[in-house]
Amino acid sequence: MAKLQWDEQGKRLYETGTSKGALNVRGAGKVVAWNGLTKVTESPEGAEETALYADNIKYLSLTSAENFKGTIEAYTYPDEFMAADGSAMIAPGVTIGQQTRKTFDLAYRTEVGNDEDGTDHGYKIHIIYNAKVAPSERAYETINDSPAAITFSWAFTTTPIQVEGFKPTSYFVFDSTKVPAATMKALEDMVYGTAEKEPKIPSPTEILELIKDITTTTTTTTTSTTTTTTTQSQG
């Protein structure tokens, strides 16, 4: 049995950065790059306990449903995002507000670093499904001796979608330090597109199909390890 070790070389991990935003507004029919994306804040809520008491003791606790929401910040946004922000273009360069807000999916990348490789250690691809943003404030100020660009900010909520074999969710994460390189490439080819294929945000069903080989390999390895251990014990 191994003794616990802390802060070993190569295991001092951290996460940073936000880049490579890919937006799919429902009904737009295409995925577009989100330039100027600066921050995605994930703020899940819910999963709150309701304690029930009986016979003068805590009998059990019920947990409320969890909701995935957050905030998106950027210096600019794709034209396609206007439909998600409640705007419509009625003529080239002319928009009106207070329209129906479309739902959207968003993929983005964050970096995984460690003490040896820095941010070259790995990365994560995050996919948010079925999101909708609320109206947000925009403050335009006069240009002065300390010029600054406006940072747009949108609070978003999500509605979970069905995932076979699991509870509904609106959030997936792929970690390149754990997912095989071939699977990560297949995912990125889907999300970012290739010379032959248009980009798309894969559905949960497509993701489950994509990772099928990983789960099969993991199950086989676990079973093999268990069998070997049992055989050695019996021997």
Regions found by a protein language model. Give the residues of each.
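Positively charged
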Residues: 48-49
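Hydrophobic membrane-targeting and insertion signals
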Residues: 2, 233-235
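Structured, beta-strand-rich domain cores
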Residues: 58-136
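Oligomerization/assembly interface segments of phage tail-like spikes and tubes
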Residues: 42-44, 53-81, 146-161
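Extracellular mucin-like PTS domains
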Residues: 219-231
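Polar/acidic, low-complexity leader/linker segments enriched in S/T/G and N/D
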Residues: 1-44
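Mixed-charge, glycine-accented linear interaction segment located at domain edges/termini
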Residues: 135-138, 142-218
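Intrinsically disordered, low-complexity coil segments
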Residues: 20-28, 116-119, 163-167
